[in-house]
A protein has these predicted regions:
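PLP-dependent amino-acid enzyme catalytic core
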Residues: 1-410
């Protein structure tokens, strides 16, 4: 049964726009945790060599559907020895989603979405996106042999577009912003018969259950001792809600003894969820004239705002906005100290954890998990000035070589 994520009333609306008609929250298909709880606990304990599909019992997917998979999931949970010590946090962890096949956590959605679409005989898919979602959907469409149309704004970063093009995606520029491109993919569904693969619960709630596996994997890596805080970047708002849902399921099954506080992070230049949280509102409003280097969370409209706000508040967490200079600082620190290059949106989670630690919210010994949702390998231009003054040395000139080495040891 489909129901509202907040008021839990049954959903009886259209099947292409899943929004609660009572409170405006997202819709879900909850797992029956009472049907065979010991089996579900066993699934969680064992984990999976098959990536997220080892947790199939926690999805609403037909039994005869063959997964379209590329080994997504089972990403490492890194205890940050150097980065944590640098910032004064002994238990700072990174859930490194950059190691998914397309370099993003969106693969957890795309594998389920494409599996469901293939089961339904879909031959074409479309998505309005300029970032991680487009990369993931294009990759899995290629794997499934589907044609993929990508609507992206003219200002989209070329590095991200090139990745999508390499998978065979067809580009169509949508005049306007990302939200206009999302609408274009949605409107085209009735005309062209493609499946709109927008990575939101209001579009594809069943596929969004793939994100819950971030929680399952993290808990297993921590021997089912739940973290005190989980820090998630927020654009549309779905990851913070679905990760928490995963923890709620484990708590209900008795696998963990407490629930983490969820921290929702946005860039200061585009922070509709943070604004709504600070003002005590239950829904977000469109953010006008935003600007940030954190392109992956540059969403003026928080599609899952009602559910995300409810999640953060129920968990005892908070929403926080981080300025671009602090995001860039965290991005560079993570690369230098942990050899992980997060995209700016992901680095924002580290910057948020640091800020909350400095403010006394997060303690020195608190267990903090930052979810790094995407790779920064497409954002390397942000490192351009790191080695701007590179010394040159002629072969055999040891004096110049010594000076060159000393140049970096100032």
């Amino acid at each position: 049964m489909m129901r509202c994520t907040v008021c839990h009333k049954p959903y009886v609306g259209p099947k292409n726009h899943y929004v609660c008609t009572y409170c405006g929250a997202s819709i879900e298909s909850p797992v029956d945790l009472e049907k065979n709880p010991e089996h579900l606990r066993d699934v969680l304990r064992k984990g999976s060599e098959d990536g997220i599909w080892g947790y199939r019992d926690f999805f609403t997917v037909p039994e005869d559907a063959q997964p379209v998979t590329m080994g997504e999931g089972n990403t490492p949970l890194i205890h940050t020895d150097r980065l944590g010590a640098f910032y004064g946090m002994k238990n700072l962890y990174l859930k490194n989603e950059t190691l998914n096949p397309s370099g993003t956590y969106k693969d957890r959605f795309a594998t389920v979405a494409t599996t469901l679409a293939k089961k339904d005989g879909i031959k074409q898919v479309a998505i309005g996106s300029a970032g991680n979602a487009a990369a993931a959907v294009a990759a899995y469409a290629a794997k499934a042999g589907m044609e993929c149309f990508i609507m992206l704004p003219p200002g989209a970063e070329k590095e991200r577009a090139w990745q999508n093009m390499s998978y065979g995606g067809h580009f169509i520029y949508g005049v306007g912003g990302v939200n206009d491109c999302v609408k274009m993919a949605e409107d085209g569904e009735a005309i062209f018969g493609w499946k709109n693969m927008c990575t939101t619960m209001m579009n594809y709630p069943l596929a969004c259950d793939g994100y819950k596996t971030i929680a399952y994997e993290t808990a297993r890596s921590m021997k089912f001792e739940a973290p005190d805080y989980v820090v998630c970047p927020v654009g549309g708002g779905i990851v913070v809600s679905k990760v928490y849902k995963g923890y709620e399921e484990m708590y209900a099954l008795g696998m963990i003894d407490h629930l983490p506080k969820m921290i929702a992070v946005q860039a200061a230049g585009c922070a509709p969820l943070v604004k709504a949280f600070d003002e005590g509102k239950t829904a977000t409003e469109k953010w006008e004239n935003g600007d940030t280097i954190a392109f992956a969370i540059f969403d003026p409209v928080t599609f899952e705002g009602v559910t995300a706000l409810d999640t953060v508040r129920r968990s005892g967490g908070r929403a926080i906005a981080i300025p671009d200079d602090k995001i860039l600082e965290a991005m560079r620190a993570c690369a230098k100290m942990e050899a992980v290059i997060p995209e700016p949106a992901s680095a924002a989670t580290i910057a948020a954890a640091v800020k909350l630690h400095e403010d006394g919210v997060i303690g020195e010994n608190d267990r903090v998990v930052c979810v790094l949702t995407g790779s920064g390998l497409r954002d390397l231009k942000l490192f351009n000035d790191e080695n701007a003054d590179i010394p040159s040395v002629q072969p055999g000139d040891m004096d110049s070589l010594k000076k060159a080495v000393n140049h970096y040891q100032k």
